[in-house]
């Protein structure tokens, strides 16, 4: 079975309310779904005889601040039986919680923690939803587009106190003007 057959079969078999949009391309096939049907759709893709997407490769987050549902969560799946890949996408806002898929794919625990830590997207029924890449006292979610580049606090080791301290960031210069014109590219009109 080839990738296009699996994709077409899935589209024809699935309840239409589970899938908002489909996209076929040479880079891979994609289903867009509502958060309400995410778990059911992943169950179908993993357990059905003609799909068998039993490997969850990755879960990624993307932030689009101009959208109403600004966060996109992307699930990349692999069927080793049929040598096929598929991408499943859903979107959420700051308060929408997405169903955890740890019961279906145990490895999802780490990736869901990463998406929560970096973007603030929360997962319902996750067994251990806590920070994974940032410190426990860290405030905010650093991969959001509205997170300041310099962060909110500076964490450093204080040698006299022999401990790690967190202090508010103090900028010595609030605004910097960068001249992007290269002096090497300036030419006067007399050169031939």
UniProtKB/Swiss-Prot annotation:
Record-linked InterPro entries: NADH_DH_suC, NADH_quin_OxRdtase_su_C/D-like, NADH_UbQ_OxRdtase_30kDa_su, NADH_UbQ_OxRdtase_CS
Record's bilayer topology term: Peripheral membrane protein
One Pfam match: Complex1_30kDa
Top-level taxonomic group: Eukaryota
Location, primary (coarse class): mitochondrion
EC numbers: 7.1.1.2
Keyword annotations: Electron transport, Membrane, Mitochondrion, Mitochondrion inner membrane, NAD, Oxidoreductase, Respiratory chain, Translocase, Transport, Ubiquinone
Gene Ontology molecular functions: NADH dehydrogenase (ubiquinone) activity
CC per GO annotation: mitochondrial inner membrane
SUPFAM superfamilies, per database record: Nqo5-like
Catalytic activity: a ubiquinone + NADH + 5 H(+)(in) = a ubiquinol + NAD(+) + 4 H(+)(out)
Places the protein is found: Mitochondrion inner membrane
Subunit and interaction comment: Complex I is composed of about 45 different subunits. This is a component of the iron-sulfur (IP) fragment of the enzyme.
Biological function: Core subunit of the mitochondrial membrane respiratory chain NADH dehydrogenase (Complex I) that is believed to belong to the minimal assembly required for catalysis. Complex I functions in the transfer of electrons from NADH to the respiratory chain. The immediate electron acceptor for the enzyme is believed to be ubiquinone.
Recorded family membership: Belongs to the complex I 30 kDa subunit family.
Protein name as annotated: NADH dehydrogenase [ubiquinone] iron-sulfur protein 3
Organism annotation: Patellifolia webbiana (Patellaria webbiana)
């Amino acid at each position: 079975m080839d990738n296009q057959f699996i994709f077409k079969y899935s589209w024809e078999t699935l309840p239409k309310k589970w899938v908002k949009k489909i996209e076929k391309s040479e880079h891979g096939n994609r289903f867009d779904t509502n958060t309400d049907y995410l778990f059911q759709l992943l169950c179908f893709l993993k357990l059905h005889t003609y799909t068998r997407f039993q490997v969850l490769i990755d879960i990624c987050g993307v932030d689009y601040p101009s959208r109403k549902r600004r966060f996109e969560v992307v699930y990349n799946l692999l069927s080793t039986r049929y040598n096929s890949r598929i991408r499943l996408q859903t979107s959420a806002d700051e308060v929408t919680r997405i169903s955890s898929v740890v019961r279906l794919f145990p490895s999802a625990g780490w990736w869901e923690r990463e998406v929560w830590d970096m973007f603030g997207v929360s997962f319902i029924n996750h067994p251990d939803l806590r920070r994974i890449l940032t410190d426990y006292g860290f405030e905010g979610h650093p991969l959001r587009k509205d997170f300041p580049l310099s962060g909110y606090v500076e964490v450093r080791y204080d040698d006299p106190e022999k401990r790690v301290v967190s202090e508010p960031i103090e900028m010595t210069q609030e605004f910097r003007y960068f001249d992007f014109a290269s002096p090497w590219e300036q030419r006067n009109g007399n050169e031939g």
